[in-house]
């Protein structure tokens, strides 16, 4: 039986035991453009450089001609059938930089706790998983692609990673003893690194109502890896009173239904009921649902777990999540006994805020305009009143009979000489001792000079 046949058989066995399979997505293959610094594979005749201090296993599936190659101190190149390297002169391809080597990207950048790097075998249209459950849970079967090279960081080690089984390099590990031997080998050290611990245990989820994921302790590292491309901060939800379900890193818009279940409840059957009976209706188009068992937040009741149903709106229509949540509550009221549901409650986010940033900007501009108009209307009377008060204070501050002169540095007029009061401009001729008539006026600043003239 080939590798693909073994994988398909294993997935069928997982379906019979209600185990969820998680597939590792990224790889460290030579022929993948995303693994190189310039987002393209090395050009023909170009130089190739691997970081000297990084351990890495690289699968090469094609033939390549290079002019120079710098290999890591501890690593391996796995050559597929027909693959190899040949020496060539420096290439002159237009897309290649002049003499710049193609550098293999850091192989330690992939983390086990990053939800972006996993794909679930239970993916279906309209179905999603909360962030903590996108990473392998303790009852999941983990598959690393048999036809690709990979390298995984196991995290800081504060929370050991435990899953049901691990399939890698054509082997399936279900016992800690076998996995420990593999991790200590050179092949294991090239593919798994970091202080974190990895263990397996054949713990089947035999409960039809489902099992808790078990990633609560690792959720801080899961959220940190998820939000790293966003600077470590959650994007603002586009609704009022946003919700944050258990296992989710950021707030979302929609609704959450919590079910108190009995022994007859079947998680897979109920998830299929939502997908087939409700999400197929036109009024619920664009909604996505996540159904899982979570620890009960309030321990006032006997049951320590409950079923969490998360409804998220991704389309332009709003209010669909709330309508579906109320429909699920009505379905429980009518068919709860047959479904094994004892009680149901719901929470719903508030109204959507479409274009909230633009609305906030427009509101700020409008407030600034109103404030400016108010200043223009109120300021002139206040300024006029303040001017009169200042003028009166200025007049009162000058005592009667005080000298009004000042020293003028240009004309050197002493301040002790009181300047005459200015006279009204007069163009009436003034008679002189002789018969000559002159038209003039007295300039108080030059009164002394004119008198001498």
Curated annotation (Swiss-Prot):
Reported modifications of this chain: N-glycosylated.
Cystine crosslinks: 43-96, 137-213, 205-211, 223-249, 234-250, 239-253
Free-text comment about domains: The complex formed by AMN and CUBN is composed of a 400 Angstrom long stem and a globular crown region. The stem region is probably formed by AMN and the CUBN N-terminal region, including the EGF-like domains. The crown is probably formed by the CUBN CUB domains.
Gene Ontology molecular function: cargo receptor activity; signaling receptor binding
Protein name (Swiss-Prot/TrEMBL): Protein amnionless
Pfam families cross-referenced by the UniProt entry: Amnionless (PF14828)
Residues covered by the VWFC domain: 202-254
Role played: Membrane-bound component of the endocytic receptor formed by AMN and CUBN. Required for normal CUBN glycosylation and trafficking to the cell surface. The complex formed by AMN and CUBN is required for efficient absorption of vitamin B12. Required for normal CUBN-mediated protein transport in the kidney.
InterPro entries in alphabetical order: AMN
Record disease entry: Imerslund-Grasbeck syndrome 2: A form of Imerslund-Grasbeck syndrome, a rare autosomal recessive disorder characterized by vitamin B12 deficiency commonly resulting in megaloblastic anemia, which is responsive to parenteral vitamin B12 therapy and appears in infancy or early childhood. Clinical manifestations include failure to thrive, infections and neurological damage. Mild proteinuria, with no signs of kidney disease, is present in about half of the patients.
Keyword terms: Cell membrane, Coated pit, Developmental protein, Disease variant, Disulfide bond, Endosome, Glycoprotein, Membrane, Protein transport, Secreted, Signal, Transmembrane, Transmembrane helix, Transport
Sites carrying sugar chains: 35
Entry keyword annotation includes Transmembrane helix: yes
Quaternary assembly: Interacts (via extracellular region) with CUBN/cubilin, giving rise to a huge complex containing one AMN chain and three CUBN chains.
Keyword rRNA-binding: no
Region Interaction with CUBN, residue ranges: 67-87
Source species of the chain: Homo sapiens (Human)
């Amino acid at each position: 039986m080939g590798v693909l046949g073994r994988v398909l058989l294993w997935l069928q066995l997982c379906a019979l035991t209600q185990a969820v399979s998680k597939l590792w997505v990224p790889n460290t293959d030579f022929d993948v453009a995303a693994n190189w610094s310039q987002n393209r594979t090395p050009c023909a005749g170009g130089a190739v450089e691997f970081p000297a201090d990084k351990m890495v296993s690289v699968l090469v599936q094609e033939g390549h001609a290079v002019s120079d190659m710098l290999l890591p101190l501890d690593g391996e190149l796995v050559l597929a059938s027909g693959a190899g390297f040949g020496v060539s002169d420096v290439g002159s391809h237009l897309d290649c930089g002049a003499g710049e080597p193609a550098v293999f990207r850091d192989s330690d950048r992939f983390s086990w706790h990053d939800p972006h790097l996993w794909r679930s075998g239970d993916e279906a249209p309209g179905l999603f998983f909360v962030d903590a459950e996108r990473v392998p849970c303790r009852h999941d079967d983990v598959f690393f692609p048999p036809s690709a090279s990979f390298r995984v960081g196991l995290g800081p080690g504060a929370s050991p990673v435990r899953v049901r089984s691990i399939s890698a390099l054509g082997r399936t590990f279900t016992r800690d003893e076998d996995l420990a031997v593999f991790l200590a080998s050179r092949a294991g050290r090239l593919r798994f690194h970091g202080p974190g611990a990895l263990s397996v245990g054949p713990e089947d989820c035999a409960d039809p109502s489902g099992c808790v994921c078990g990633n609560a302790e690792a959720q801080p590292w899961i959220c940190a890896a998820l939000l790293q491309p966003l600077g470590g901060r959650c994007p603002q939800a586009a609704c009022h009173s946003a919700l944050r379900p258990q296992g989710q890193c950021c707030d979302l818009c929609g609704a959450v239904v919590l079910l108190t279940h009995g022994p007859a409840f079947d998680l897979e059957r109920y998830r299929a009921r939502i997908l087939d009976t409700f999400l197929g209706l036109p009024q619920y188009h664009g909604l996505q649902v996540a159904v899982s068992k979570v620890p009960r937040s309030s321990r006032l009741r006997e049951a320590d777990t409950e079923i969490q149903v998360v409804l998220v709106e991704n389309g332009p229509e709003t209010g669909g999540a709330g309508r579906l949540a109320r429909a699920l509550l009505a379905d429980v009221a009518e068919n709860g006994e047959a479904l094994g549901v004892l009680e149901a409650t719901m929470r719903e986010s508030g109204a959507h805020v479409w274009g909230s940033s633009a609305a906030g900007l427009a509101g700020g501009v409008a407030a600034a305009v109103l404030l400016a108009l108010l200043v223009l209307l109120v300021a002139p009377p206040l300024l006029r009143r303040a001017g009169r008060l200042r003028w009166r204070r200025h007049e009162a501050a000058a005592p009667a009979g005080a000298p009004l002169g000042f020293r003028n540095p240009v004309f050197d007029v002493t301040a002790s000489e009181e300047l005459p009061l200015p006279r009204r401009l007069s163009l009436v001729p003034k008679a002189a001792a002789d018969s000559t008539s002159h038209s003039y006026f007295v300039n108080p600043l030059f009164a002394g000079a004119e008198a001498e003239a």
